From Swiss-Prot:
Pfam family, one: Trp_syntA
GO cellular component entries: cytosol
UniProt similarity note: Belongs to the TrpA family.
Superkingdom to which the source organism belongs: Bacteria
Annotated EC: 4.2.1.20
Alphabetized GO MF terms: tryptophan synthase activity
Record's protein name: Tryptophan synthase alpha chain
Amino acid sequence: MTAVGEALRRCRAEGRAALVGYLPACFPDVERGIANLQALLDGGVDILEIGLPYSDPVLDGPVIARAADVALRAGSTTAAVLRTLEAVAASGAAAVIMTYWNPVEQYGVDRFAAAVAAAGGSGLVTPDLLPDEAEAWLAASDAHGLDRIFLVAPSSTDERIALTVRFCRGFVYAASVMGVTGVRERASVQAPELVARVRRYTSLPVGVGLGVGTAEQAAEVAQYADAVIVGSAFVRCVFDAGDDAPAALRKLAADLAAGVRRMPATG
């Protein structure tokens, strides 16, 4: 079992959902990016999703796309992302890389998988890769003991969900709303139904992402999901806080961590 699998099992034993925090690597530069990820852990994030900045982030909203641009201008490379992963994993963190598929193919699929494993990573979240087009990744992830986290969405047919979860390992990423990433004023009404549909086909943990940005939303999603995934809210926090980003991230992470631990109201 990977470190991510262990973290999810520990959270389940505690009777709560896991908090997954996303930030791009090298944002706003390599060293401050590492410090920001560490701040998420210090605030109570259970699992890190480290984004590999990409020049054509078609599934990301304006906040994350802007952050990727900042990271690329600061000199983000695949090697720098792997160094970031190694730095946070060395502290004991459970971490995965979230990446579009093109950079992995350019680096070499097996070579990339080997590098992620060597750096202490648990696997990859691959938002634009379909499992039935992922033969090289399936083989590489098996060879190097990595989790494969594919996405499903409200628009996914039952057949597509069944196929996708069959090839997932670690957890299933349920994109709770249609469209690009970003904080919503309210959590998606489609998310509980999507999670229920996924659970018809797998016993893997299900994480819900896209739109969660407040403790109240985290508490709501934690009532039906195994993991609450937060991205854009953390990225916006870095932009807003500037040099004070680590302290601001710790506070926001602590608020969200309290949210996933909140017991639902009764009566």
